[in-house]
């Protein structure tokens, strides 16, 4: 197999034709995805707050950037075409009470189109959970065959199933027969280099009536190490007629366009780069528009002020979702009130944890960001986290509005194993 177009994409971009771009749209079954960009499902990340935040960030134009791109990009072409939920256990979902399911299946109307991702190994249980997702109004349902986490693989879920193609076929057939909405699968190359099954699996998916496939171009054994092997995305694209979504090592707009040019995939899926650079979907649209218009791709890079605005926006969304209720925090007398108080306090702790996590990601690549991250992790309350962030950006010379492009950071490579 030919060597892939390796991702020193800024160099490769100079040699790409002016027409090279991420497709404007694709259709998965009857669902229109425009543009052809997908936010990857990530455990502990892609809850409803983050998904809506990404949708907003994708349409956000840095007001103060000295390099504001003047190419026209509509809201639609500047957004993320498809978002996906955190992966959800089919076994757990099928056994949950209706009230508890809401935690995993909550979404808002402005999130459409949205796909619910499931993992598991029992065809009947997965089919039952797919029906639950369809009834909840999701536009698509997706099967996770990519998660490399030991706890998931131990249950024969995620990438663990890549060693059992007959079971995968049974799952494909049972789920496909159970739901009318588009059914897709996200998978890896195979278990290891001696067991690469991606082409065979993609053909099986097509034969079983699935509507699209998404390939993370690494094996389970690789985890996130080494380079994604885009040549296998090209091989899958050559093997099937259903849409193929490419995933792996897309950190910049140049990477996204280079992947499409090298593999002819129908869409790109972005995972770990999105929490660190929420602007990436809009940047892809800007890069494509300017490349078509002038032959040279350009895009806005966030300033310090832009980063501060986005951190503030995320925190506001997070706290709105937690929905503070001061009366619950007062004296609790009944058992029901005590349960409500415990649940609320737990939600507050979770919100503060997420604030720390995302503030850390958003400040990677910013000079002095390491100091801020240390201060953030010492904070005990959400208000303290925001005070640290505000003080940091106030101290910097924001009047200069220097652009702060995201730098490649080793900590982003150490992503949670459950991100698939």
Residue ranges and their predicted role:
Residues 1-33, 37, 43, 64, ...:
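Alpha/beta catalytic cores of nucleotide-metabolism and tRNA/nucleoside-modifying enzymes
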Residues 15-27, 42-132:
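Glycine-rich, positively charged N-terminal anion/phosphate-binding segment
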Residues 33-36, 91-114, 147, 152-155, ...:
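N-terminal small/glycine-rich loop or linker at the start of catalytic domains
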Residues 42-44, 88-90, 119-121, 146-148, ...:
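Active-site beta-loop-alpha junctions enriched in small/polar residues
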Residues 85, 139-148, 207-217, 270-273:
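Non-cysteine beta-strand/loop elements that form the S-adenosyl-L-methionine
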Residues 105-111, 132-137, 176-177, 203-207:
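Acidic (Asp/Glu)-rich catalytic clusters
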Residues 115-138, 160-167, 196:
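Glycine-rich anion/phosphate-binding loops
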Residues 150-167, 218-229, 291-298:
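Glycine-rich tight-turn/loop motif centered on a GG-T
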């Amino acid at each position: 197999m030919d060597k892939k177009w390796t991702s020193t994409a800024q160099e490769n971009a100079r040699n790409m034709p002016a027409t090279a771009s991420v497709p404007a749209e694709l259709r998965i079954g009857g669902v229109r995805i425009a543009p052809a960009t997908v936010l990857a499902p990530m455990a502990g990340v892609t809850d409803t707050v983050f998904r809506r935040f990404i949708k907003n960030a994708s349409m956000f134009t840095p007001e103060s950037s000295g390099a504001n791109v003047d190419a026209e990009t509509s809201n639609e072409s500047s957004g993320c075409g498809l978002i996906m939920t955190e992966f959800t256990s089919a076994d757990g979902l099928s056994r949950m009470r209706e009230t508890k399911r809401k935690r995993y299946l909550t979404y808002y109307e402005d999130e459409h189109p949205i796909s619910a991702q499931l993992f598991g190994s029992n065809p009947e249980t997965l089919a039952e959970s797919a029906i639950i997702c369809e009834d909840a109004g999701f536009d698509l349902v997706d099967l996770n065959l990519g998660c490399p986490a030991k706890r998931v693989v131990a249950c024969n879920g995620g990438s663990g199933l890549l060693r059992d193609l007959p079971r995968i076929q049974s799952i494909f057939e049972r789920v496909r027969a159970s739901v009318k909405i588009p059914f897709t699968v996200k998978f890896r190359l195979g278990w290891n280099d001696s067991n690469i099954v991606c082409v065979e699996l993609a053909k099986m998916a097509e034969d079983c009536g699935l509507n699209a496939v998404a390939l993370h171009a690494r094996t389970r054994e690789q985890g996130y190490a080494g380079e994604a092997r885009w040549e296998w995305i090209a091989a899958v694209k050559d093997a099937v007629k259903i849409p193929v979504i490419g995933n792996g090592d897309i950190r910049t707009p140049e990477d996204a366009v280079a992947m499409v040019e090298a593999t002819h995939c129908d869409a790109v899926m972005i995972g770990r780069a999105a929490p660190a650079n929420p602007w990436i979907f809009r940047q892809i649209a800007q890069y494509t528009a300017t490349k078509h218009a002038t032959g040279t791709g350009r895009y806005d890079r966030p300033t310090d002020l832009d980063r501060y605005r986005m951190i503030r926006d995320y925190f506001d969304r997070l706290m709105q979702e937690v929905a503070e209720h001061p009366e619950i925090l007062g004296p609790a007398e009944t058992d029901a009130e005590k349960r409500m108080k415990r649940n609320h306090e737990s939600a507050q702790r979770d919100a503060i944890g997420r604030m720390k996590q995302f503030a850390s990601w958003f400040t990677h690549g910013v000079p002095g960001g390491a100091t801020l991250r240390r201060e953030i992790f010492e904070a005990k309350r959400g208000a303290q986290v925001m005070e640290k962030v505000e003080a940091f950006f106030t101290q910097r010379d924001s009047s200069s509005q220097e652009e702060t492009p995201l730098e490649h950071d080793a900590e982003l490579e150490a992503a949670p194993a459950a991100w698939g």
